[in-house]
């Protein structure tokens, strides 16, 4: 049975990271510290710019977040790749939430533009993912556009984020 709520809190995201939300062997979020948002405030199959799905997630930015201490010493900034990874995480979550089977993997993107930096003085990051297409076959493939807004200002724009869910073969199953 899939969990199809319209929003998810932090404990739910951790359950997803443990493989408990969509079932064993299916889409999972990474666990902290690589989980890059605190909640999914909204998820739907019909919303968004293209009418094919919308996800809105939030991260409360705190000066003691793990990456500020090492990237960079004396000039703390969230690595851009982490914001991008959050967008891929959300597309994968959407595929699992939509009924897709198998573990997810980021497959690429068409274009990415940065116009700002997430620094410790930022209070909140909001990720918005607009689903453009979901292909359902042996491979479930999600294609989406995404933004990262910091305190209401868009800093990242990604086009054609691609994530796939792959049915595991016996050879790909983890050893017990």
From Swiss-Prot:
Coiled coil: none annotated. It catalyses: a (3R)-hydroxyacyl-[ACP] = a (2E)-enoyl-[ACP] + H2O; (3R)-hydroxydecanoyl-[ACP] = (2E)-decenoyl-[ACP] + H2O; (2E)-decenoyl-[ACP] = (3Z)-decenoyl-[ACP]. GO terms for biological process: unsaturated fatty acid biosynthetic process. One of its GO terms (molecular function) is trans-2-decenoyl-acyl-carrier-protein isomerase activity. Pathway: Lipid metabolism; fatty acid biosynthesis. The active site is at residue 71. It is found in: Cytoplasm. Homodimer. Belongs to the thioester dehydratase family. FabA subfamily. This is 3-hydroxydecanoyl-[acyl-carrier-protein] dehydratase. It comes from Rhodopseudomonas palustris (strain BisB18). The gene is fabA.
């Amino acid at each position: 049975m899939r969990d199809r709520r319209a929003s998810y809190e932090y404990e739910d995201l951790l359950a997803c990271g443990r493989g408990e939300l969509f079932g064993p062997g299916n889409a999972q979020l990474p666990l902290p510290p690589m989980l890059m948002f605190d909640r999914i405030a909204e998820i739907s199959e019909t919303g968004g710019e293209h009418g094919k799905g919308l996800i809105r997630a939030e991260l409360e930015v705190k000066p003691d977040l793990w990456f500020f201490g090492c990237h960079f010493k004396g000039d703390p900034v969230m690595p851009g790749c982490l914001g991008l990874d959050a967008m891929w995480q959300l597309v994968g979550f959407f595929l699992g939430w939509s009924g897709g089977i198998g573990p997810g993997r980021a497959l690429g993107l068409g274009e990415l533009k940065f116009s700002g930096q997430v620094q410790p003085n930022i209070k909140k990051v909001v990720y918005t993912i607009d689903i453009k297409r979901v292909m359902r076959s042996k491979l479930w493939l999600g294609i989406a556009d995404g933004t990262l807004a910091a305190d209401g200002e868009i800093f990242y724009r990604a086009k054609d984020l691609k994530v796939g869910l792959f049915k595991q073969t016996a050879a790909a199953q983890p050893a017990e």
